[in-house]
Amino acid sequence: MGIKGLTALMRDNAPGAIKEQKFESYLDRRVAIDASMHIYQFMMVVGRQGEQQLTNEAGEVTSHLQGMLNRTCRMLEAGIKPIYVFDGKPPVMKGGELAKRKDKREEAEAALKAAREAGNQEEVEKLSKRTVRVSKQHSQEVMKLASLLGVPVFEAPCEAEASCAAMCKAGLVWAVATEDMDTLTFAAPRLARNLMAPKSQDKPVLEFDYDKVLAGLGLTPEQFIDMCILCGCDYCDTIRGIGPKTALKLIKEHGSIEKILEEIDTEKYPPPQDWDFAGARELFKNPEVMDTTGIALSWKAPNEEGLIDFLVKEKQFNEERVRAVCAKVKKARQGKASQNRLESFFGPPTIISSTIGKRKVEEKKGKNGKAGLANKKSKGVSGFRRSKN
């Protein structure tokens, strides 16, 4: 879920913390990627037509593999160095959020059945996306794919985004690539959004600088965590009626959730029953993450025959296109090996600015990119069948 309303809050109050970057400007950058979140997105949208997903001859869904293959190839061709991190066990405090998601999925499944019976194709397409489940097998298949492509792979002990943030803080990577803003709540120095967006969307990468976020909002790291909890996070409920703007105002006035509870009208703004905001705060401050000491990152040439065995023989991908992907990646490795980062070659980044009542781009306006990932079909390796969810 991330943090509700955090992006808009930063645009309005800390615009200097956000830069629009070109995808190509990440040449030779190491980037930790929350793979589990992107698998879910690929399962929802890649190759989908109505409620039909891409499958192999055995009826196994392959949307996640096509999506990850396309995006990984694009990054490697651009000289970007991805590291994929996968979720481990969920924290106990996330149990409530996971239960809510399960309930919503079951509601969507019931509504989907009714929409099918009514012949409402628009509702069928919308609801089928809400029933998507990412299994352990899906994650393991993407791990195998990434390894065969020569990309470093890690399984976090708990939340992937927390371990990604730890890698960034340790200086192992330049940024964390994810769409979930709570990566900043884990104090990742840089967060990159849209890095995994398809090329067809032509979206600029939005890079968020953690230190500039704190400076722009006028908060300490501890206050930023409390504000995010008030906005709404995955680990606990929040106070109904208090949105992001009010959350920022209250934290700046009182300094902590404890002080806020002493001052606000709790009849008008009743806190949740048994509200464990302190537990959520501790999870953000001291999450369970992988040990970053002694990690040696390396990117290898793709294992072409291994990819043929896995993607072509097992998953029925098109062999010619898989070999073409391998050729592109190998060529890119040879071409980028001697290149150094020259940020001036790409020009200065665009700084996001804010004015009262509207938002604008200070140096130049990037394309709006209104069509989200769910509105575009990804082009790439073909050779699939379609099956209903």
UniProtKB/Swiss-Prot annotation:
Keyword Hydrolase attributed: yes
Region annotation N-domain: where it falls in the sequence: 1-105
Highest taxon above the source species: Eukaryota
Residues reported in the UniProt entry to bind DNA: R71, E159, G232, D234
InterPro entries noted in UniProt: 5-3_exonuclease, 5-3_exonuclease_C_sf, Flap_endonuc, HhH2, PIN-like_dom_sf, XPG-I_dom, XPG/Rad2, XPG_CS
Keyword annotations from UniProtKB, A to Z: DNA damage, DNA repair, DNA replication, Endonuclease, Exonuclease, Hydrolase, Magnesium, Metal-binding, Mitochondrion, Nuclease, Nucleus, Phosphoprotein
Binding sites annotated in the UniProt record for Mg(2+) 1: D34, D87, E159, E161
Binding-site list for Mg(2+) 2: D180, D182, D234
Modification after translation, per record: Phosphorylated. Phosphorylation upon DNA damage induces relocalization to the nuclear plasma.
Annotated Pfam families: XPG_I, XPG_N
GO biological process, one term: base-excision repair
Entry keyword annotation includes Magnesium: yes
Segments for region (Interaction with PCNA): 338-346
UniProt-annotated stretches for the region Disordered: 356-389
Cofactor requirement: Mg(2+)
Segments of this protein annotated with the region I-domain: 123-254
Record GO terms (molecular function): 5'-3' exonuclease activity; 5'-flap endonuclease activity; DNA binding; magnesium ion binding
One GO cellular component term noted in the UniProt record for this chain: mitochondrion
Cofactor stoichiometry and binding remark: Binds 2 magnesium ions per subunit. They probably participate in the reaction catalyzed by the enzyme. May bind an additional third magnesium ion after substrate binding.
PANTHER family on file: FLAP ENDONUCLEASE 1, FLAP ENDONUCLEASE FAMILY MEMBER
Reported function: Structure-specific nuclease with 5'-flap endonuclease and 5'-3' exonuclease activities involved in DNA replication and repair. During DNA replication, cleaves the 5'-overhanging flap structure that is generated by displacement synthesis when DNA polymerase encounters the 5'-end of a downstream Okazaki fragment. It enters the flap from the 5'-end and then tracks to cleave the flap base, leaving a nick for ligation. Also involved in the long patch base excision repair (LP-BER) pathway, by cleaving within the apurinic/apyrimidinic (AP) site-terminated flap.
Family listed: Belongs to the XPG/RAD2 endonuclease family. FEN1 subfamily.
Assembly and interaction partners: Interacts with PCNA. Three molecules of FEN1 bind to one PCNA trimer with each molecule binding to one PCNA monomer. PCNA stimulates the nuclease activity without altering cleavage specificity.
Descriptive protein name: Flap endonuclease 1
